[in-house]
Amino acid sequence: MNKKVFSTLFLAVFSVTLGVGLVVPLLPVYAYELGATGLYIGFIFGAFSLSRTLFLPYFGRLSDLKGRKPFLTTGLLAYFLVSIAYVLSKNVSFFILIRFVQGVASAMILPVAQAYVGEITPKHKEGFMMGLFNVSLYAGLSIGPLVGGMVKDSFGIHSSFLSMGLVSLIGFLLCLIFLPPRAHERFIKPDKPPLRYRILARNRYIGALFMFRFAYTACIGLVWAFLPLFAHAQFKLSSSAIGVLVMLGVLTSGLLQTPMGFLADRFNKRALIAIGGLVTAGAVFSFIHVQGFWGLFVANILFGVGGGISVPAVMAMTVIIGRRTESMGSVMAILTMGHSLGMFAGPILAGIMTDAFQLSLAFMGGTVVMVICVAVALLLTSGFQAWAEV
């Protein structure tokens, strides 16, 4: 295990997720001030997910062929330039273009960094190392919105954008200086090119993890998009109270990543995925029946626990598959595509159900999707341990 490389990747990903957390909650307000309607605000968020999803397969496979460092440094530098572009944006169309470019940059960073960590992770420590690495994501997403709001209130929204640029620049410099040159970064040297996506797509274990990741992040998108509306409409909660609730789930899941990753290396990974998935489904279902702030408080903790149990096991299995297929970047890209598609589809499908029926049915729909995907994932991953040890 190369501690310098791991620490550099950890800090770089923390910096970029912190930067995202600094500005994303502020984007709807800024877009509205530029004259965006509700539809264009949807385009602003959709452009990011669309470009990220489109470019993930390309950069994932290319990083298997060309190395990780060039993509990490390019993506982080692009984030810095995007932050400057936010400040200079004067109309909605340019704002949408910026978000599209940011999605492309995002496709170069997280899956490539996760693939790099997967490559340097010792056997039988996949859960612990990926769980520890995931702390960088959850920490950035937990701290970012709080700091971003404080910076905006004190210095204005442009300062929040520039803060994103600063932390992205720090991440870029860390990777540029401390990651080894491309020629020396491959700690596992495959003796053949990475598998093509059409071959990886036929791997039932990848399909199972993709399906679970899609369902789980669709539930995240549902909760993040509609919990504020539900909490305000049903219980008249303040914006600060709603912010605490949303952050609570992220924080809980983040705190569980490392200990549950440790368990994933020692116990049945499929069982942990099933338990975490069912806890997540139960939490989403409970939102319909809770009463008041404290009911939502408990439901959000439960939602975070579900992710905290399941995600390290999912990532551990992903690393094992990537190592076995000698296509770590491509496999990570596929799983991240599931994440992106879930975050894109979850709020949209929930919105359709809310408009056609009522808000509570959106949470019911998320519950059903999660339970079905847990069952299918369990079926498809049968025999995984024997396959992994061949």
Stretches found by the model and what they are:
Residues 26-38, 225-240:
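Short amphipathic helix-loop junctions that connect adjacent transmembrane helices
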Residues 1-2, 180-210:
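Juxtamembrane intracellular "pre-TM" segments in multi-pass secondary transporters
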Residues 49-57, 141-142, 250-258, 343-344:
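Residue-level signature of mid-helix packing/kink "hotspots" within the transmembrane helices
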Residues 93-101, 294-302:
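Paired small-residue
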Residues 108-121, 309-323:
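Intracellular juxtamembrane helix-capping segments at the cytosolic ends
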Residues 98-137:
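Cytoplasmic helix-loop-helix junction between adjacent transmembrane helices
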Residues 35, 67, 88-93, 236, ...:
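Helix-breaking motifs and short loop linkers at transmembrane-helix boundaries and internal kinks
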Residues 70-84, 165, 271-285:
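Structural signature of the two symmetry-related core transmembrane helices
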